[in-house]
Regions:
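Periplasmic polypeptide-binding modules associated with outer-membrane biogenesis and secretion
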Residues: 2, 6-11, 45-165, 176-180, ...
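C-terminal transmembrane beta-barrel domains of outer membrane proteins
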Residues: 5-10, 92, 342-542
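Outer-envelope beta-barrel architecture signal
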Residues: 50, 132, 142-144, 157, ...
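Transmembrane beta-strand segments that form the barrel wall of outer-membrane beta-barrel proteins
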Residues: 91-92, 123-125, 142-152, 159-182, ...
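Feature captures outer-membrane beta-barrel proteins of Gram-negative bacteria and organelles
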Residues: 159-168, 186-199, 217-229, 234-236, ...
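Outer-membrane beta-barrel translocator domains and adjoining extracellular loop/strand segments
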Residues: 161, 187-192, 216-222, 234-237, ...
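Transmembrane beta-barrel wall of Gram-negative outer-membrane proteins
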Residues: 193-299
């Protein structure tokens, strides 16, 4: 697709200050038109040179010079498979023989970074014997994740151990197994993901959770949208299993039920307008769900078994806008911050003849937008959905958030994040649940639960060193959190914390991978024990 204004640039206007004193003759007009027509290819060539060749270079976690200087770095490279060049080539949105398009080049770089296996992506141009060549270089991140994670908050400790390979045999496919232990349950999770099977746009993603109180399996298979210019997509989503649903009130478990579910959704989408400058997408969906809630021990809640079907239609509009930052969520790598304006409106229809006691209509809206302020940005998001039955409002949910990030000088970032949410009439287990890494960071799991909630955080980060010993980033942070959740029949429950933290990140790994050790002072509601605590876990990503 030609860049905006391309045609206009082919037709030069009169020189500045010139004046036409007499009407031109027909012969003069013909000569001018002929000259413009002959000049058009030259102008187009100057404005959009033709790409003669594309060179793809993939590099290991450590460059050859680094591996030669440090034997351990050489061993690390030898233990893994470098990403295959064809994995990079299949993501390219430009081709040899076509005009160079800077917008498509930028989108290609974003898509490559979004795969999550590279620590650095660069796309540049060069001239070889006078011809334009595009050089694509990727540097792998350490994608074999030996997970030995722990999180401690106020005397509560959770941990997980496992192995996940996000670049299996250099193909950008994912395999892994993780065991986790938290206060609610233990679980073994198996995961597999095949991107672009057989060189196509197709996707297969499966996961299985074997829990101490149930088991759940899920999958996604289809052909997703992978670029702004893609015209078609289709996917089939499924979830089958049984799981224990826990409900909490004032930080204490109040109820427990077992949910048995079989859910299947087929969705297809078409984009009547699609290109690097945005898209309009139309989609249709159909779903079938069998859901049952049964008592789990004494005091359980019973919800009747239901087999139901529904149909949905949606329209989505997007105008893309991105900014690239460093030292925002992680060390020594570029991060794509999505500031696009996107609006999606969906309407679900649930006829009474498909298992519902009454017919219902469920409108949904999602909207988000952002604006770059130099190296800073402001971003907002709103989501709302409701289900109207023939005689009443059955359920509803609304959530909004605002993030302001200020990066005044290199290696430092100040972030203000605010969000609020309200829910009504949703099934058990759908309550707002804050604590232990979600919401105020120095509080235990389920410290704040309810159908209404709000929280915010103000944090300043200093990424002091990117690569100590060539592999570790070290930084410091100060933070203030405040917020909570509560039910409609109780007063607001709000608590907060203020503290300092140490940030440690593996700069040669894929992803941001920043861990935290925080010392915090707690105030307000929702805490027990000592006001001063030490918490260990992952850094929040905004």
């Amino acid at each position: 697709m030609e860049p905006a204004g391309f045609v206009e640039r082919l037709i030069p206007g009169p020189p500045s200050g010139s004046a036409i004193r007499h009407p031109p003759s027909a012969r003069a007009c013909l000569l001018v038109a002929l000259a413009c027509w002959r000049a058009a290819p030259a102008v187009a060539q100057e404005r959009a040179p033709i790409v003669d060749s594309i060179i793809v270079r993939t590099y290991d976690v450590f460059d050859d010079s680094e591996a030669a200087a440090n034997a351990l770095f050489g061993v690390v490279n030898a233990l893994r498979f470098r990403t295959r060049p064809e994995i990079v080539r299949r993501e390219l949105l430009f081709r040899a023989g076509a005009p160079y398009d800077a917008v498509r080049v930028a989108e290609t770089a974003r898509n490559l970074r979004a795969i999550g296996i590279f620590r650095d992506v660069s796309i540049d141009t060069t001239r070889i014997e006078g011809r334009l060549a595009v050089v694509v270089e990727t540097r792998d991140g350490w994608s074999t994740q030996l997970q030995l994670n722990g999180r401690s908050t106020g005397g509560e400790f959770t941990w997980s151990a496992g192995l996940i390979e996000t670049n299996f045999l250099g193909t950008a496919n994912v395999v892994g197994a993780v065991y986790r232990d938290d206060p609610d349950r233990t679980a073994l999770t198996l995961r597999g993901r095949v991107n672009r099977a057989f060189g196509t746009r197709s996707l297969l993603d499966v996961a299985y959770d074997d829990r101490s109180d149930g088991e759940v399996g899920g999958w996604v298979v289809g052909v997703p949208f992978r670029a702004l210019s893609d015209r078609h997509a289709v996917d089939l989503v499924g979830v089958v299993g049984r799981e224990r649903v826990l409900q909490f009130r004032d930080g204490v478990r109040a109820d427990s039920t077992e949910r048995r579910v079989s859910f299947h959704r087929l969705q297809g989408a078409f984009a009547p307008r699609a290109g690097p400058d945005g898209y309009v997408r139309l989609s249709l969906a159909a779903q079938v769900k069998r859901e049952e809630y049964v008592a789990y021990g004494a005091g359980g809640q019973n919800v009747p078994d239901s087999l139901s079907g529904a149909f949905g239609a949606a329209v989505e509009w997007l105008h893309p806008r991105f900014t690239v930052l460093t030292h925002y969520n992680g060390f020594a790598r570029e991060e794509d911050v999505d500031l696009s304006t996107r609006v999606r409106v969906t309407v679900w229809v649930a006829p009474s003849g498909l298992g519902y006691a009454r017919s219902g209509v469920g409108p949904q809206i999602e909207a988000r937008s952002g604006v770059a302020l130099g190296r800073s940005f402001l971003r907002a998001r709103l989501e709302a959905n409701q289900l109207f039955l023939s005689d009443r409002l059955d359920s509803a949910r609304v959530r909004g958030s605002v993030t302001l990030a200020v990066l005044p000088i290199g290696r430092q970032a100040t972030v203000l994040h605010l969000q609020a949410e309200a829910r009504r009439g949703l099934p058990p287990g759908s309550e707002i649940d804050l604590g232990h890494g979600l919401g105020p960071r120095a509080f235990r799991s389920h410290a704040f639960t309810g159908t209404r909630g709000a929280w915010g955080t103000l944090e300043h980060r200093w990424f002091a060193w990117d690569e100590l010993l060539g592999v570790i980033g070290v930084g410091f942070a100060g933070f203030l959190d405040y917020g909570g959740a509560w039910y409609g029949d109780q007063p607001r429950r709000l608590g907060g914390d203020v503290g300092l933290g140490l940030m440690i990140g593996a700069t040669r790994a894929s992803g941001t991978n920043v861990g935290r050790v925080d010392v915090a002072y707690r105030f307000g509601d929702g805490w027990t024990g000592n006001r001063w605590i030490v918490s260990v876990g992952r850094s929040l990503a905004y």
